[in-house]
Amino acid sequence: MLRFIFTRFSLIIPTFFGMTLLAFFLIRLVPGDPIETLAGERGIDPIRHAQLLKDYGLDKPVLVQYGIYIGRVLQGDLGKSIITQEPVLREFLTLFPATVELAVCAMLFALLIGIPAGIIAAVKRNSLMDHGVMGISLTGYSMPIFWWGLLLILLFSVQLGWTPVSGRISVKYFIEPVTGFLLIDSLLSSDKGAFWSAASHLILPTIVLGTNPLAVIARMTRSAMLEVLGEDYIRTARAKGLSNLRVVALHALRNALIPVVTVIGLQVGVLFTGAILTETIFSWPGVGKWLIEAIGRRDYPVLQGGILLLGLLVMAVNLLVDITYGIINPRIRHQR
């Protein structure tokens, strides 16, 4: 098992350096520079512009800039935002709990609906229920996040007035941050009104962000269950007189979840990329909205640091998924 973990962990190193290359060079393909953006419409004196480029090291050749950047990254220094002059890591850690809270709620939404829906579709194969679940899953998978988000806002916020449009909590509540997760912090402060406000603000973003993973998980669960339900040991269990519920719950589900666990790990990356659009639509003060604003400002350190930190997080989650996969399926960890 240790060898299996070490092998998976060693793959992170080249992936990490690949991410630094992408984060550094792709950003510089965007026209303009952050100094011009910082100056705004009033413009900036050419001499002052050249001096600021030198101060931020942007006057050096790109490869030299990358060498300086990677050296600082290896020391844990992601630089400072050109716009706010705050350390990138500090800004990221301040906003990250909001993104995690949204991503966790979206994943729970996807799991609690997607897995049961996939199981029911497999058990009721070729029935109206099966076709309905797969049809809805295909629709959810194909639906653009920005369109789905605007549609839900128009229906539930504008027309019906059931849910808030934007933000994490109503402006009339102030919660002292303890964990950074408003649902938890509002419970710790024993403020029920703040808790329900935070929960209501989560409803639409959770649905929008969780729809795509829900569709993928439902389809994968159905496919895995259908494959397992056709195995000989399942037919043997049924021949012994076990009820359909016991066959599915005790024998089929555990083996069917093996490929589903892998898909769940892959959906973590989908959640964080989807969070960029979702947070923008709902003005959710998280890392995704922060990165979108940094793109408009050409804030290189923020973009590089944010992309790198999110990439490391996704790699860490995928490593945990691989380890979990090896625990569930011993054949995987013994493969050379």
Question: Where in the sequence are the language-model features?
Answer:
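Alpha-helical transmembrane segments of integral membrane proteins
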Residues: 2-4, 96-129, 145, 158, ...
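N-terminal signal-anchor/signal peptide hydrophobic helix marking the start
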Residues: 6-12, 16
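Hydrophobic alpha-helical segments of integral membrane proteins
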Residues: 9, 52, 62-78, 88, ...
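Residue-level signal for discrete positions within transmembrane alpha-helices
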Residues: 12, 95, 99, 135-142, ...
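Hydrophobic alpha-helical transmembrane segments of membrane transport/permease proteins
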Residues: 15-67, 156-194
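Hydrophobic alpha-helical membrane-insertion segments
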Residues: 16-21, 140-161, 263, 267
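An internal, D/E-rich "acidic patch" concept
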Residues: 59-115
